[in-house]
Each structure stands twice: as structure tokens, then as C-alpha cells.
């Protein structure tokens, strides 16, 4: 059986790892053992934070809405209650965007929600 020299495949595998760790500092970018560990950990962080990103953005939208409805004399929870009572089914992402970019439209929605609470 012929001897198999693995230099080419090993080099290709190492290149793949180094491509992931490009921009890392210290040994983590250019020593294969440390680079593999760093690349694995980076993948774990990426997986975890793709899930966390959804929570973080929802929290941001809620904070923005809470700040936007305070001038209308409501809290966030009362605003959401008013929206559901008035039958407005707009999600928090769109409401947050409206509050920032279309204040007049958001004001109309907030007043409808407030009217639904009073009724």
C-alpha cells in the first residue's frame, strides 16, 4: 500500500480554521491548536447570540414604546392593553418604528388606544 502524504489536506484544513480566526489577537489567530479552540468558542457565542438577539431587540422596542407613550399619559402596559381593546394588531417592531419615524401616525394610534381604555 502506498504512503499517503497529508501535507496538502492538512494545510487546507488549517487554512479553513485560520480564515475563521482572522482578526483575533495573540496566539488565537496563528497557532492551530489555539485557533481551533477559539473558532469553536466563537461558533458557540454566535449560536447563543442569534437567540439572544431576538430578546434584545424586543426589549429595545418595548423601551422605545414606553418612552413614546409617556407623553400621552400612559405606561407601556396600559398602551398595549388599549391596543388590544381597540382591535389594533400592529406588532411592537412596527410601533417602535412609527414612534421614531412617523410621530403623527403614532400619536393617532396612541389616542385610539387611550380612548379604548376610557370606554
From Swiss-Prot:
GO cellular component assignments: ribonucleoprotein complex; ribosome
SUPFAM superfamilies (alphabetical): Ribosomal protein L20
InterPro entries, A to Z: Ribosomal_bL20 (IPR005813), RIBOSOMAL_L20_CS (IPR049946), Ribosomal_protein_bL20_C (IPR035566)
Coiled coil stretches, renumbered: none
Keywords: Ribonucleoprotein, Ribosomal protein, RNA-binding, rRNA-binding
A molecular function (GO) term: structural constituent of ribosome
One Gene Ontology term from the biological process aspect of the record: ribosomal large subunit assembly
Key word Transcription regulation present: no
Pfam family, one: Ribosomal_L20
Superkingdom of the organism of origin: Bacteria
Keyword Ribosomal protein on entry: yes
Known function: Binds directly to 23S ribosomal RNA and is necessary for the in vitro assembly process of the 50S ribosomal subunit. It is not involved in the protein synthesizing functions of that subunit.
NCBIfam families: rplT_bact (TIGR01032)
UniProt record similarity statement: Belongs to the bacterial ribosomal protein bL20 family.
Protein name: Large ribosomal subunit protein bL20
The organism of origin for this protein: Nitrobacter winogradskyi (strain ATCC 25391 / DSM 10237 / CIP 104748 / NCIMB 11846 / Nb-255)
UniProt gene name: rplT
